[in-house]
Each structure stands twice: as C-alpha cells, then as structure tokens.
A protein has these predicted regions:
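Edge strands and adjacent loops of beta-rich recognition modules
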Residues: 558-569, 573
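Flexible, glycine/threonine-enriched loop-and-boundary segments that flank and lead into catalytic domains
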Residues: 399-427, 570-588
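Generic structural motif
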Residues: 367, 371, 437, 583-595
Length: 609
C-alpha cells in the first residue's frame, strides 16, 4: 500500500494483509471449511460484436395458420467483459437505434453525435438510415401550452413571438430542439439528402442534453419548469418582461448543467475503464470484424460508427450474419478467471470502505471471496463417489451462472449440438432434464488456450503423408473453418501414407471427398470427439445414443468395491482415468518396485534426476 504525505512530499510503501484466499490443491479443487469444492468452468459468449437477424410475422387473426406478412429486423450486439451491453438495431422502417437494457432507445444520429463525431463525418455514410428516425414531436408546442396555462398575460406574447420566429427560420426557431418538420421520408430513396433538406444538426453538447432528456425526463429543464418556480407578475408588462428574462437565463444555466449530466452519464457508461471493459478478446474481435487498429479496451466512437456502417451492409446483403452458437463466438471462463473477477469486486468494496471510514478493514474483501465460494452456482460440492465422478466434475462446462443462460428460457438452438463441437465438447455426455445441453463435458484431448478458446489436436498432412514426427497442432473452431480435415479412423499405412482413393473430409460444416494430396490435417484418435466417461463404454459404436448418454452418466454413480477387480471387457483408458483423478499414488520416477508394504513402496530407479 502507498501512503503519501503531501505536506512533506514523502511516499511510504507498506505491506498490508487485505484478505485470505483458499489454495487450490494439486488435484484441482479447493478445501473450504473442511469440504472439497470445485469451481466449474463457464462457457459464455465471447466479448465482441455479433450481427443477427430476427423474423417478425404478422397474423391477420389469432387462429390463422399463415402469417399475413413478415419482415426481418437486423441488429448488432456489442458485448463487453464488464459493463453495459449495447444493441444497434434497425426497425422495419430501416431506421437505426441504439438500445440498452431497461432504458429507452436513442436515435443513432444522436448517439454518434454524443460520441464526439461531426455532422459531416456521420453523413458521409449512408445517411438515410441515420436521420430517418429524427421525426419526433417538437417540444416547443407543449412548452407554450404549459406557459399559457400558468400565466394568461404572457400567453399571447409568447405565442406571437414563437410564430414570428417560425416564419423567419423554420430550422433555427429553437436551437435546443432538432427541427423535424422540414424532413420528409421517402422510403424508395436511398439518400434523403439529395432531394430533401435535412434539419438543423446538433452539436455534441446538445446531443448529450437530448440523451439526458430521454433518461431523466423528470429533471428536464425548460421554460415551463423554470416558470413554475417564479411568482406570477402582477402589474405592468415591464415586470412581466423582466421576469421572463430571468426565466430564460435560469433555463440556459439548467440546460448547460443538464448537458453536463448527459456527458457524465455517457462517459461512465461506455468510456470509463473502470465501468466498461471489452477485454483483449473483445478488442481483438472488434478490430478483426470492423478492420480497425485500436488498442483501447473501452468503447470508442469509431467502433460505433463502423459497427453501424457494417449493419447497413448486412441489411443490403453485402455481409452475412453471425452464428452465435459457433464455438468461435464462445469462450471458457476457468476457475482462475472467475476468482480474479471476484477479487476485483472485493477490491472495489475495500476501496469504498476505506474512503468512507478512513480505516483499513479486510472484512469487505473476505466477505466477497466467502460469498463466491459459498453461494455462487459455479462453486459446487465436489462429486467424490468414485474417481471418474471427480474427474468428470472438474472437466465440466456450464452455460448457466452469472452472465449466462437461464435454464427456463434456454432454447433448443442453445442446447443443440453444433458442428464446431467436434473434438471439443462431447455430444453424448450431458445431464437429463432441464439442464440438457446447458451442462456439457470437454472431450478427451481438448484443451483451453490462454484466451479461453477450446482447441482440438490434429496431425499435419503433406501430399498424402501424415507428419506425426512434426508434433501435434491444436486448432480452434475458427481455424478449422478454413482447412480440410480428415477423420482419425481413416486407414493409414505403416509408412504414414493415406489411401489413394478419394478421402472423406470436412470443410467448415460441409462433407465431401477429395484426393489425398489436398488433405491438410487429420485427427489423432477416433475417441477425440467424446468425453472420458463416454470413452470408457466398450463397443460404443454399436450402442444407441440415448443408452450411451445414460451409461456415461450412471458410471459416475457406481460405488467402489472393497476388493477392486479388473473389468472383463474394457477400453484401455481405465488406468489413465484413475491416475489423472488423483485417487492413486503416482511415482515421480520410473523404475522397478522392490518393496511393497502398508507403510511404503520402494522403487529402484536408474535415473539420477
């Protein structure tokens, strides 16, 4: 901790214990209050930008089978690691809006202005989509009515002055309000600016004011609100005119303050690194998708502007929508990342308590850690019925939990099997009931890389020759889309050559046959598509899929015997499953066993390491 004395300009550094963390054992679980607990891996949508479409159907009557008409709505979800999710959507009139949860939607033109762009920069893109939704009711008529109801003496004067200003300049009669009466929408025209005059365009401070008016309507400053606090003038017109000038001055100050409120809200929502963070994976996804080169992990104006332009091109058919269920768009949160997120929450609580009380107390930090390990749905009591149950529990992937899917609202698309699951997520082992498809298991050879992406191992193939000596290549689901993969059960000769006949391969999601010279990679094992529990089922290829699912789940419920025996029929993976679970003693060196007793096992080894 750094303690700074501003008067004497002295900086002192001291070590302070801020809390306690449980230590992970060598077997991969935690001991909390004497009980073993496992942090389950969580698989979520990866931070980034995703374009999707939704079809809306209008029925003439409730009992009619065919819809009267239908339309497609395109939208883009801007997903971050920490902060507010933003959605850029296009309605059926092809107007673009920015929307957040539990908040009114904002016209995209206002949103881009608030991000700091000029009118020329925004209108350099396809402006018909951006300014078409600026047709809202003008506010000045309502204000005139309110003023007239408050004061009858000023009613005629304010009406006449407003009418004169309208005739002089339709666009600039009230500069704090965008004038939309002069804008007419022609849906058949791609560009509105070529034929119709566009309204008076706002500067960023006024855009912040409009955004604040949307989110805080009860605090909206205006002439009517200011007039309600001023006593009604009784007497000559001079007093009335003087009071009106005071009201206008007060309203200008309030509008400036209100623009500042909108600006602060906008900064804290999207541009504050402590409140909004895309993460490395999210920033990489934005840069790759939108062809940008930005290092900042917060949301920038260029991100929103180019995302809007990309959405317009998706609607025109230039680009395709994204498959959100593809594993390239999902990542795994391991135990370390989940605990680090909770540590961040604990540090924020600790900072708040230090600022309020001016005293360091580690209760806030410890309570956050205790809350995660004790009450989080991702912290579970470890299944220790047999070694396989423990090993499977630690290799489990769940889509539920904080920030995940709700089991009651999960659709079949989320629960289903995707082609990108091959070699990464087992298609067989999943619970029965409400959690079907939401809780899965990693395959036998799958691994999680530093970015949380699931990878599967393959051998390189060069001109029909399998290069096993060059090592194993781990490929992600996105890398697999661009290469030609052969299955691992294809016959390979003793000199590692593929057969001369056409070889069945998978290219992205399509299956075809190609010559062996065009094959790029081949699987390393025929069991790399199934999990460890499923690989222990003998003759799995002759088993029904439903029975295999029940068998892989019921193996975890088997009670160990007092005198264990070898299985009559096995698959050869039993020893590896038991050794990896940590339930047996494993020698660190190879050698000959010379002595075995209840107290010790002696191994004679020639190695000197």
């Amino acid at each position: 901790m750094q303690i700074t004395d501003k008067k004497n300009k002295i900086v002192n550094l001291k070590w302070i214990a801020i809390g306690n963390l449980p230590i992970m054992t060598k077997r991969g679980h935690f001991i909390l209050n004497g009980a073993a607990r496992v942090i389950v891996n969580q698989i979520l949508r990866s931070p980034g930008i995703y374009y999707q479409q939704k079809i809306y159907e209008n029925y003439e009557e409730k009992w009619s089978q065919k819809p009267k008409d239908s339309y497609i709505r395109y939208y883009a979800d801007l997903i971050c690691m920490r902060g507010t999710w933003l959605r850029i959507e296009m309605d059926k009139e092809k107007n673009i809006w920015a929307q957040m949860k539990k908040l009114p939607k904002i016209p995209m033109f206002w949103f881009l202005l608030a991000m700091g762009f000029s009118e020329k920069k925004i209108l350099s893109f396809d402006s018909g989509y951006l300014i078409g939704n600026l047709t809202t009711t003008p506010l000045e008529k309502k204000e005139i009515k309110k003023i007239g109801s408050k004061n009858s003496q000023l009613n005629d004067k304010t009406k006449n002055s407003n009418m004169k200003d309208k005739k002089k300049n339709k666009h600039n009669s009230n500069k704090t309000i965008i004038r939309k009466n002069s804008l007419e929408i022609d849906k058949n025209k791609k560009s509105l600016l070529s034929r119709y005059s566009y309204p008076y365009l706002k500067t960023p401070p006024e855009a912040w004011e409009h955004i604040a008016q949307l989110f805080f309507p009860q605090n909206t400053p205006g002439i009517a609100a200011s007039f309600s606090k001023v006593p009604l003038p009784s007497g000559s017109a001079k007093k009335a005119r003087a009071s009106k000038n005071n009201v206008e001055n007060n309203s200008k100050e309030k509008k400036n303050n209100f623009a500042l409120i909108g600006r602060k809200w906008f900064y804290n929502r999207f541009m504050n690194p402590r409140a909004y963070d895309l993460g490395k994976q999210g920033r990489w996804s934005f840069n790759r998708k939108l062809s940008l080169n930005i290092k900042n992990t917060t949301l920038t104006g260029l991100d929103v502007l180019y995302a809007t332009d990309y959405l317009i091109k998706v609607e025109k058919g230039v680009y395709k929508t994204d498959d959100i269920d593809h594993l390239k768009n999902r990542r795994v949160r391991t135990a370390g990342e989940l605990i680090s997120i909770q540590i961040g929450i604990g540090l924020v609580r600790l900072e708040k308590s230090i600022r309020e009380k001016n005293f360091i107390n580690n209760k806030a930090f410890n309570s956050a850690i205790r809350e995660f390990f004790g009450t989080s749905p991702l912290s579970q009591f470890m299944d220790q019925i047999n070694p396989l149950a423990e090993l499977t529990h630690k290799r489990r992937l769940t889509s539920m939990g904080p920030g995940g899917v709700n089991r009651d609202n999960a659709t079949l698309a989320i629960r289903g099997i995707h082609p990108s699951h091959y070699g990464r997520i087992c298609p067989i082992e999943t619970p029965e009931g409400k959690n079907t498809g939401l809780v899965n298991s990693m395959t036998t050879y799958a691994r999680i890389n530093d970015y949380g992406i699931l990878e599967s191992p393959y051998y390189k193939v060069y001109k029909g020759l399998v290069l096993k000596n060059t090592g194993i290549f781990f490929l992600s689901a996105e890398q697999e889309e661009k290469i030609k993969l052969a299955a691992a059960d294809i016959f390979v000769s003793q000199i590692s050559c593929l057969p001369k006949a056409l070889i069945p391969v998978r290219i992205s999601e399509d299956f075809t046959r190609i010559p062996r010279s065009q094959v790029q990679f081949i699987g390393i094992s025929s069991i790399q598509m199934i999990s460890i529990a499923t690989s222990l089922i003998p003759f799995l290829e002759h088993d029904d899929a439903n029975r295999a699912l029940m068998g892989s789940n019921m193996q975890r419920q088997a009670v160990p015997l007092i005198r264990p025996e070898r299985p009559i029929v096995g698959t050869g993976l039993e020893a590896r499953a038991v050794s990896d679970s940590g339930h047996v003693l494993i020698s660190k060196k190879s050698g000959f066993v010379t002595h075995v007793s209840a107290n010790k096992i002696v191994i004679f080894s020639c190695s000197m390491d």
